[in-house]
Amino acid sequence: MKNKTNLGLSVFFFFICLVSVTSDLEADRRALIALRDGVHGRPLLWNLTAPPCTWGGVQCESGRVTALRLPGVGLSGPLPIAIGNLTKLETLSFRFNALNGPLPPDFANLTLLRYLYLQGNAFSGEIPSFLFTLPNIIRINLAQNNFLGRIPDNVNSATRLATLYLQDNQLTGPIPEIKIKLQQFNVSSNQLNGSIPDPLSGMPKTAFLGNLLCGKPLDACPVNGTGNGTVTPGGKGKSDKLSAGAIVGIVIGCFVLLLVLFLIVFCLCRKKKKEQVVQSRSIEAAPVPTSSAAVAKESNGPPAVVANGASENGVSKNPAAVSKDLTFFVKSFGEFDLDGLLKASAEVLGKGTFGSSYKASFDHGLVVAVKRLRDVVVPEKEFREKLQVLGSISHANLVTLIAYYFSRDEKLVVFEYMSRGSLSALLHGNKGSGRSPLNWETRANIALGAARAISYLHSRDATTSHGNIKSSNILLSESFEAKVSDYCLAPMISPTSTPNRIDGYRAPEVTDARKISQKADVYSFGVLILELLTGKSPTHQQLHEEGVDLPRWVSSITEQQSPSDVFDPELTRYQSDSNENMIRLLNIGISCTTQYPDSRPTMPEVTRLIEEVSRSPASPGPLSD
């Protein structure tokens, strides 16, 4: 009898637990449906007749929703009040959508939340302080949004917080005194000011660029009476009021100072006018030289560096007419100055996403490449800070940055010159009888070299991305060694200047060319691999060749036919013995171009996989290390 009673109680409690779990999962289901119905943009294709744990992006444990990952799926509009009902949620990711408005207040109910990824949206308003009261939060990424106001003072309440990314917003004020031990931190490209707190002085310099900040790891703060390197607004002294006599004295002093300045300017103008009269009289008797710079300026042609020492927008070769000279990072390529660079004979190499490129040849034999940046949207201080970071980057498969020049009208970047030009020109250029096709070994070497360069960039910092990976930015040396160019320039350029021809490489979640990510780089690199193997251009128009949606085209062919059918005929005509390795590299490219960012491999993983392909016995030879 006793055993029957125990059995009955066990069954009773089992059904109680089952009903409880079912009701909790039903509450989660209602919250997810409210989210689906409340957001705009691309609809979430969830099968409402199936259990919510089977829906795309939803992950469950013990019958409850513990993770919701919907990165780059085209959601837009404000988030509804719904997610706070997912009380067992540990991971929430809405990365790289077009969501806007403030964060819903019911986020405060997510007491088990550990990872929050909201970067790459258009969320606005102040960063809610309740995010830092979540007891289990470990990682917060709010980068690349439109958040305003100050960083909440209660950051230290999040005692388990290890990562805080707030870059590329519109935050103002000082950084609060953060005492918790953060492993990753970034507030670059905001409007913050003041001194950097000592506990953050060990963070990389790039974490603070694009603000009015001072102190380690940036330049030291100016010494003043406030003790923190900044002028404290509203600071109280013994008296904030000035006497009437002091005010009168200040007014008289200002008047006298203005009068003196006026007299100085007046005298200088008269002197300059006399000099111009004398100069004009002497010039009247001399022949008038023809200025190719002036002709170029009137023709409204594409920007160029012209050989007589002026750029096409009229920048003079006269050293007195330029504000500053070149800033060098390496001088092993040879000595030259701005005047010499502008006098060098120039040849147009091409017009890219960020500006036009030229081959500059000096009389003494030195040859360099010059990129003339257009639509730079960052101020001079931030431009110089970012270029200093780029100048410190060195890798065998990255084009070396030699020097740069900044003025109001000109932004020039000088790189090493690569004699064989770009991969794009070799793949899609003249295919006449005199052209030597790229064989499998050369293409595999190019893929590996480019992968190593991008992997190196990603290893420097979790927020460092190339941002503009395409075949025209893969340059080749005389020995066909691949070197990647145009790295890390995207955040400085206006997104309106990025043409449609890069769309074929752009990841589906990227809506703003300046808001890039490492996973988006992986997608672009995957397209590059497919381009190498198929010989087809992914851009809308490339050297008069019609472009295709490469990932979709490759997917459609491989689903219906043999994978070998996608390969460039020039690649398979003479090297059928390498077919197995080509298919392996093709699969790497396909995995990189998966629609969902979280499903893509990292660049170190991609590099390792390509290295394994190179070591395969079927390969024509080991790829260079």
UniProtKB/Swiss-Prot annotation:
Molecular-function GO terms, alphabetical: ATP binding; protein kinase activity
Transmembrane segments: 246-266
Residues bearing the modification Phosphoserine: S345, S422, S517, S619, S624
Domain Protein kinase: 343-613
UniProt KW keywords: ATP-binding, Cell membrane, Leucine-rich repeat, Membrane, Nucleotide-binding, Phosphoprotein, Receptor, Repeat, Signal, Transmembrane, Transmembrane helix
Induction: Transiently up-regulated by the endophytic fungus Piriformospora indica.
Biological processes annotated in GO: response to symbiotic fungus
Domain comment in the entry: The protein kinase domain is predicted to be catalytically inactive.
Family per similarity comment: Belongs to the protein kinase superfamily. Ser/Thr protein kinase family.
Miscellaneous remark of the record: Induction of At5g16590 is not observed in mutants devoid of PII-2, another leucine-rich repeat protein normally associated with the plasma membrane microdomains.
Protein name (Swiss-Prot/TrEMBL): Probable inactive receptor kinase At5g16590
Organism: Arabidopsis thaliana (Mouse-ear cress)
